[in-house]
């Protein structure tokens, strides 16, 4: 593994000691562990010899951009560097930063310790200490026994706050160390910034939303204009959390002194900081971010047929780095397949990205036209397993050859079998499902509840009449209504003394007509309990069928299902055939179930935790709109990309918060913030800091609710904790006085811990 060091620059007369400082950086970066990418953002020709003289270094590349007529944008230059970086992790290294070889070794070791190749949501800042002129001379003229001892000497001087050495610190600095995939996905720097000023804080704000180390400050959006770490106020203090810990491990850069630079139009401090607050609030409210950046190392060009104002667009951004050069356009801009084909040919598009192609008739026509012309495409939608999604270049659901036996029937190794067995065990015993279900109650409880006795159970889960698979892949049943007719026929002909038919409506479908002669489970009854209870499962083509195979239950399909193959689920041709299958022995081939599941888990399905917003369709039925997907693994085109999970928060009792006064001082700051704002409520999670979305939500101009871990006031009859919360809300002064008095003997009422 290597790390790409990105150096953005434009060499001019005003760039102090440009050649000397650049050469020093290159000499100090270990070639075996780092690659160097210089982004030449419009250096005039008369200074080009400085860069030409560097081309002999094997670990260095120079990207030249003809941007000399534009204001120098260090943010844009960094973005370009990430787009062309060949390594999975990047480090931003400005020309005035100084670190010796040992310091870069420490940075490399930190990246390895965090496994940042496979944990993409993790990041840190290399703290930067701005040296005085004397401090710069001292650093560059030092003659220590080793680089390690030199770094210890400098670290001590910084720690002891020698004013003649360091002018000021920046713990949450622009020297970010970040995963390339993640950076491309969030879009890099906002294109709204002009010149220099505040652009790094916007990036840090968004990066930190995926990895929150603690509660955000009560006045988070406030620019305190101070980088000190003794007061937990404003966003600068919050971003410092991403550099304090690595500084304590001896990792830092020194910013070498230089005369004040005067570049017309470059410094846009006032304008950009005003813009920063608006961008931060937009992101917190609506997840507004710049468009994802193209990955220049993937030469394909992909057209995404998607509305960039939609929540789906925001949710899929961590898929985009896989698809090279990115073009985003609404499908409605193409009146028919001919107009789409013209655009593809004119703009040299290599691939089309579709959301569910059966989502509407217009999209389906475009999809079928693209397939007919053998144009490469990719289809994205939710899978049948919890947290599963698929990127399929063969088709959609039943119409895809990705599920054909030749794709998945292969001998598994013992390790592969163990992997699948472990997944199936966890799936069967988990409460996690695609749709909301109540807590599990066991199949034994249901057997008593429904008075099953010794009878067998046929479980029938219904689907929504408007779903894609019940509309386009309805097969022999024809429709949900047709399938209900099957169930009614079977109910009339199955001996009631031998069988019980238990039906369950889809959680979002409240108005489906009921079938006579069957039992109905409550809408929120846990689907796993019902499957576990069943002897056989009859359905159209629901994902419940795939989960039922994990329980090794015989599954009979009345419609076209992608998992209906010999040894797995069995297709029925009509209601009479379905009845015969119910009455006869039907076996599930465990070996084939393991093979199919291994294929799904390692070749077809990607996985990511998602959040949804509930809304109403135009016909009044309930509907869920995707809000966010935090992918942890992506399977695409025989590649597996591990993204990892969003790191957990850190306890307020951790040394990370000592400089801010620890838990007690930080809670006092929240209390003081409440006193200054009218009607503020503090709602505190007394267990852990786990939610990376902790922030203040302003409910009105004069009233706000400080949400820590998004835990809201409990409206139920209060117990001991509830009474304390009420006291906290109504009389915060008395609450905190009592809490401080009792802190030594009772530390469990008001705390953050892991």
Where is each model-derived feature located?
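C-terminal catalytic/acceptor-binding lobe
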Residues: 17-18, 195-300, 683-686, 734-749
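Leloir-type glycosyltransferase catalytic cores
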Residues: 399-448, 568-684, 688, 723, ...
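Glycine-rich, basic loop-to-helix element that forms the pyrophosphate-binding segment
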Residues: 68-84
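Short beta-strand-to-loop acidic/aromatic patch adjacent to the donor-nucleotide binding site
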Residues: 87-100
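Conserved catalytic-core segment of nucleotide-activated headgroup transferases in glycan assembly
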Residues: 16-18, 440-507
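Catalytic donor nucleotide-activated moiety binding site of glycosyltransferases and closely related
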Residues: 40-54, 485-521
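Conserved catalytic core of nucleotide-sugar-dependent glycosyltransferases
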Residues: 82, 106-191
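Short, well-formed alpha-helical segments that are part of the catalytic scaffolds
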Residues: 12-29
């Amino acid at each position: 593994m290597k790390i790409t060091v990105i150096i953005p620059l434009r060499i001019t007369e005003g760039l102090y000691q440009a050649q000397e400082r650049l050469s020093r950086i290159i000499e100090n970066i270990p070639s075996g562990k780092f690659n160097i990418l210089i982004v030449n953002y419009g250096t005039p020709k008369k200074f080009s010899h400085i860069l030409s003289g560097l081309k002999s270094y094997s670990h260095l590349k120079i990207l030249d951009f003809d941007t000399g007529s534009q204001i120098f944008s260090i943010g844009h230059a960094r973005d370009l560097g990430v787009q062309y970086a060949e390594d999975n992790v990047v480090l931003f290294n400005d020309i005035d930063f100084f670190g010796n070889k040992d310091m870069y070794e420490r940075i490399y070791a930190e990246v390895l310790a965090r496994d940042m190749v496979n944990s993409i949501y993790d990041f840190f800042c290399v703290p930067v200490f701005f040296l005085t002129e004397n401090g710069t001379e001292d650093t560059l003229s030092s003659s220590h026994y080793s680089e390690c001892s030199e770094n210890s000497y400098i670290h001590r001087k910084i720690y002891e706050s020698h004013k003649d050495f360091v002018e000021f610190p920046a713990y949450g600095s622009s020297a970010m160390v970040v995963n390339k995939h993640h950076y491309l996905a969030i879009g890099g720097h906002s294109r709204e910034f002009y010149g220099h000023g505040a652009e790094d804080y916007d990036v840090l704000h968004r990066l930190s939303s995926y990895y929150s180390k603690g509660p955000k400050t009560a006045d988070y959006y406030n620019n305190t204009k101070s980088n000190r770490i003794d007061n937990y106020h404003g966003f600068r203090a919050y971003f410092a959390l991403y550099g304090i810990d690595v500084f304590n491990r001896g990792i830092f850069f020194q910013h070498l002194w230089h005369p004040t630079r005067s570049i017309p139009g470059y410094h846009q401090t006032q304008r950009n900081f005003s813009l920063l607050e608006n961008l931060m609030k937009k992101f917190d409210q609506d997840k507004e971010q710049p468009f994802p950046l193209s990955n220049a190392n993937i030469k394909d060009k992909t057209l995404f047929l998607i509305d960039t104002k939609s929540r789906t667009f925001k949710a899929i951004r961590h898929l985009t780095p896989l698809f090279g050069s990115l073009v985003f356009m609404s499908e409605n801009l193409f009146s028919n397949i001919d107009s789409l084909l013209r655009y593809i040919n004119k703009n040299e598009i290599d691939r089309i990205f579709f959301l569910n192609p059966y989502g509407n008739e217009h999209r389906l026509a475009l999809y079928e036209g693209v397939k007919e012309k053998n144009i490469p495409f990719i289809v994205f939608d939710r899978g049948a397993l919890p947290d599963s999604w698929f990127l399929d270049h063969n088709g959609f659901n039943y119409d895809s050859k990705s599920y054909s036996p030749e794709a998945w029937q292969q001998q598994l190794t013992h390790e592969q079998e163990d992997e699948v067995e472990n997944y199936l065990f966890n799936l069967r015993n988990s409460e996690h499902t695609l749709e909301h279900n109540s807590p599990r109650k066991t199949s034994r409880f249901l057997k008593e509840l429904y008075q099953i006795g010794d009878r067998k159970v046929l479980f029938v889960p219904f689907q929504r009449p408007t779903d894609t698979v019940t509309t386009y892949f309805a097969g022999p049943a024809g429709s949900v209504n047709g399938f209900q007719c099957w169930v009614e026929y079977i109910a009339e002909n199955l001996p009631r003394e031998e069988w019980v038919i238990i039906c369950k409506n889809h959680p979002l479908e409240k108005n489906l007509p009921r079938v006579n002669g069957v039992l109905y489970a409550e809408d929120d009854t846990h689907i796993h309990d019902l499957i576990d209870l069943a002897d056989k499962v009859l359905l159209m083509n629901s994902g419940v069928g795939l989960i039922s195979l994990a329980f090794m239950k015989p599954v009979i399909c009345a419609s076209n299902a992608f998992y209906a193959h010999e040894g797995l689920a069995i297709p029925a041709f009509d209601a009479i055939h379905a009845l015969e299958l119910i009455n006869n022995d039907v076996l599930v081939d465990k070996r084939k179930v393991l093979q199919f599941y291994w294929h799904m888990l390692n070749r077809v399905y990607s996985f990511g935790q998602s959040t949804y917003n509930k809304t109403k369709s135009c016909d009044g039925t309930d509907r869920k709109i995707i809000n966010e997907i935090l992918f942890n693994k992506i399977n695409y085109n025989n590649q597996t990309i591990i993204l990892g999970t969003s790191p957990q928060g850190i306890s307020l009792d951790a040394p990370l918060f000592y400089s801010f006064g620890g838990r007690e001082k930080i809670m006092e700051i929240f209390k003081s913030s409440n006193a200054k704002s009218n009607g503020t409520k503090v709602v505190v999670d007394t267990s852990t800091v786990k939610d990376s979305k902790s922030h203040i939500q302003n409910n009105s101009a004069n009233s706000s609710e400080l949400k820590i871990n998004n835990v809201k006031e409990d409206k139920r009859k209060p117990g001991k904790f509830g009474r304390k919360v009420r006291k906290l809300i109504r009389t915060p002064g008395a609450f905190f006085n009592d809490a401080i008095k009792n802190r030594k003997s009772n530390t469990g009422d008001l705390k953050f811990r892991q």
